[in-house]
């Protein structure tokens, strides 16, 4: 699923979140939540 919401600098969708700032700036993209860039990734 695509991370389509930006809250507090984090891209949030379907229980996952990604930091938009370096060094995890590539965490969220049109393909969704790229977990390997996100140490704090959460799933439903």
UniProtKB/Swiss-Prot annotation:
GO terms for molecular function: ion channel regulator activity; toxin activity. Keywords: Bromination, Disulfide bond, Hydroxylation, Ion channel impairing toxin, Neurotoxin, Secreted, Toxin. The modification 4-hydroxyproline is found at residues 23, 39. The modification 6'-bromotryptophan is found at residues 17, 36-37, 43. Expressed by the venom duct. Disulfide bonds join 3-16, 11-28, 18-33, 27-38. The keyword Secreted applies. It is found in: Secreted. One of its GO terms (cellular component) is extracellular region. Its main location: secreted. The cysteine framework is XII (C-C-C-C-CC-C-C). Mu-conotoxins block voltage-gated sodium channels. This toxin reversibly blocks voltage-gated sodium channel in cephalopods, with no alteration in the voltage dependence of sodium conductance or on the kinetics of inactivation. This is Mu-conotoxin-like Cal 12.1.2h. It comes from Californiconus californicus (California cone). The lineage of its organism: Eukaryota, Metazoa, Spiralia, Lophotrochozoa, Mollusca.
């Amino acid at each position: 699923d695509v991370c389509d919401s930006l809250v507090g600098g984090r891209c949030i969708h379907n229980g996952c979140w990604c930091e938009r700032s370096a060094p995890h700036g590539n965490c969220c993209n049109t393909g969704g939540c790229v977990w390997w860039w996100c140490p704090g990734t959460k799933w439903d």
